[in-house]
Amino acid sequence: MEFNKARNIIGLRVLSDNVIWLMAKDKSVVVIDPSVHEPVIRYINENNFHLEAILQTHHHSDHIGGTKSLIEKWPNVKVIASSKEKKRIPFQNVSVEDGETLNILGEEVKIIEVLGHTSSHIAFFLNGENPVLFIGDTLFSGGCGRIFEGTYQQMYSSLERIKSLPKNTLIYCAHEYTKANILWALNLKPKDQDIKNKLSEVEKKLSLNELTIPFLLDEEMKINLFLRAKNLEEFTFLRANKDLWV
């Protein structure tokens, strides 16, 4: 379990490498991409929270696998997902579109469409003094999501959108992939000191059984080769290369 005390965001490690994020305020909590339900229910009950909403970035089973059971336990919970995902996330009851804003836990949350990994992937952005982005599988520390349904152009454009956000944005992705991503980047850029430093930082955190996520956008732009790509051609080469990395 990991904490961000500035916004009371909690990370639950589940499955092999998933992280379920929960954000609490007073006695209400929202959960992002619940791949399973048991640890979420346990945490909510232990802390006497009320589940206000479930935020779904996309339809993959390791992101929605626990949602139905959470709905059974809290029938009035809001399930927020892309309006384009009504067939694949049929239990959504708040359908949203790119650019729309919602009030969640008393804060304004903006919907940002980040296509590429899937054809209707969205992210949830909270602005302010300590901006936060729940990005699902579009961006990882040192990497980006595989392109399953979208196009290279869509993913590249999505990353450009992310880069335009405030540089102090803290980014919450849904998987602990950092070390593998950094090792791949070092294979391509073996003399890059920023990436070398990142690997040392990551290995230290992992040795202490700590998560390497979330991560700051400003720092990520220095070490993430996908964010450093100058054009679509360079991005396409990098993504194709990463797909072959073992």
UniProtKB/Swiss-Prot annotation:
> What's one Pfam family the UniProt record gives for this protein?
Lactamase_B
Keyword Hydrolase applies: yes
Key words of the record:
Hydrolase, Metal-binding, Zinc
The Enzyme Commission number assigned here is 3.1.2.6
Q: Which InterPro entries match?
A: Clx_II_MBL (IPR035680), Glyoxalase_II_hydrolase (IPR050110), HAGH_C (IPR032282), Hydroxyacylglutathione_Hdrlase (IPR017782), Metallo-B-lactamas (IPR001279), RibonucZ/Hydroxyglut_hydro (IPR036866)
User: One GO molecular-function annotation for this sequence?
Assistant: metal ion binding
Extract the signal peptide range.
none
| Cofactor(s) essential for the protein | Zn(2+)
Q: Which reaction does it catalyse?
A: an S-(2-hydroxyacyl)glutathione + H2O = a 2-hydroxy carboxylate + glutathione + H(+)
Pathway-wise, it operates in: Secondary metabolite metabolism; methylglyoxal degradation; (R)-lactate from methylglyoxal: step 2/2
Keyword Amino-acid biosynthesis tagged: no
Lineage, top-rank taxon, reads: Bacteria
Write out the GO biological process terms: methylglyoxal catabolic process to D-lactate via S-lactoyl-glutathione
Give the disulfide map: none
Q: Which residues bind Zn(2+) 2?
A: 62-63, 137, 175
Q: Which CDD domains match?
A: hydroxyacylglutathione_hydrolase_MBL-fold
Cofactor note text: Binds 2 Zn(2+) ions per subunit.
Q: Tell me which SUPFAM superfamilies the record gives.
A: Metallo-hydrolase/oxidoreductase
Identify the residues that bind Zn(2+) 1: 58, 60, 117, 137
Q: What does this protein do?
A: Thiolesterase that catalyzes the hydrolysis of S-D-lactoyl-glutathione to form glutathione and D-lactic acid.
Assembly description? Monomer.
Q: Which PANTHER family match?
A: HYDROXYACYLGLUTATHIONE HYDROLASE, HYDROXYACYLGLUTATHIONE HYDROLASE GLOB
Q: What family does the entry list? A: Belongs to the metallo-beta-lactamase superfamily. Glyoxalase II family.
By what name is this protein known?
Hydroxyacylglutathione hydrolase
Organism per entry: Prochlorococcus marinus (strain AS9601)
Query: What gene is it encoded by?
Result: gloB
